[in-house]
């Protein structure tokens, strides 16, 4: 019998990543108000948000592991979560094009049996293509960038505008699989315990 993994996220990309490696998570959306958190640096911000999301869901479960994640993109000192609307997405892309950004994904894992919590952060450098205003507008019109931290989906059309990555590919999608596996190991589990 596998150990239940509860994903405290509405992200279809995170769920799909877990399913690709043989884990079928129970999905519970935390609805945590992210605007209540202020942090001194991006790394601390994403780890705190991930932990708050997981902690919001944890009391609903007596067993299993709760996984919370949060991603933001930092470009030239500006931190980008999901854009509010199309005009903000266009403005961000005009600043991002031709630049190198840093994608931070905070991971929080709560073991309900042992009442322990781990937080970690995956960091990946993203090199963006220098695309035209027309391409930016066409991409934003697909509405894909409105659903993603950093205004792009690597696993979607946005992948066309990324020239290269330095670091973990799955981290950019929203969940670093190698980091998640290591967190399980740190708790004394194996990834196969969740198949």
Swiss-Prot record:
One of its GO terms (biological process) is nucleotide metabolic process. The lineage of its organism: Bacteria, Bacillati, Cyanobacteriota, Cyanophyceae, Oscillatoriophycideae. CDD domains: Maf. Its EC number is 3.6.1.9. Its cofactor is a divalent metal cation. It comes from the Bacteria. Nucleoside triphosphate pyrophosphatase. May have a dual role in cell division arrest and in preventing the incorporation of modified nucleotides into cellular nucleic acids. Belongs to the Maf family. This is Nucleoside triphosphate pyrophosphatase. One of its GO terms (molecular function) is nucleoside triphosphate diphosphatase activity. Its main location: cytoplasm. It is found in: Cytoplasm. GO terms for cellular component: cytoplasm. It comes from Microcystis aeruginosa (strain NIES-843 / IAM M-2473). Keywords: Cytoplasm, Hydrolase, Nucleotide metabolism. It catalyses: a ribonucleoside 5'-triphosphate + H2O = a ribonucleoside 5'-phosphate + diphosphate + H(+); a 2'-deoxyribonucleoside 5'-triphosphate + H2O = a 2'-deoxyribonucleoside 5'-phosphate + diphosphate + H(+). It is an enzyme of class 3 (hydrolase). The keyword Hydrolase applies.
């Amino acid at each position: 019998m596998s150990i239940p993994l509860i994903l405290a996220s509405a992200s279809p990309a995170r769920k799909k990543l877990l399913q690709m490696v043989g884990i079928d998570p129970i999905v519970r959306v935390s609805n945590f108000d992210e605007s209540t958190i202020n942090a001194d640096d991006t790394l601390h911000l994403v780890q705190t948000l991930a932990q708050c999301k997981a902690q919001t869901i944890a009391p609903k479960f007596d067993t299993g592991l709760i996984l919370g994640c949060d991603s933001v993109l930092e470009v030239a000192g500006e931190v980008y979560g999901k854009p509010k609307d199309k005009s903000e997405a266009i403005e961000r892309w005009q600043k991002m094009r031709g630049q190198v950004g840093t994608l931070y994904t905070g991971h929080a894992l709560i073991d309900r049996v042992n009442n322990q919590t781990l937080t970690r952060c995956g960091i990946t450098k993203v090199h963006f293509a220098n695309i035209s205003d027309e391409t930016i507008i066409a991409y934003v019109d697909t509405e894909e960038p409105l659903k993603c931290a950093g205004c792009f989906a690597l696993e979607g059309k946005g992948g066309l505008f990324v020239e290269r990555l330095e670091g973990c590919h799955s981290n950019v999608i929203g969940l670093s699989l190698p980091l998640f596996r290591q967190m399980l190991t740190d708790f004394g589990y194996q990834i196969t315990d969740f198949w």
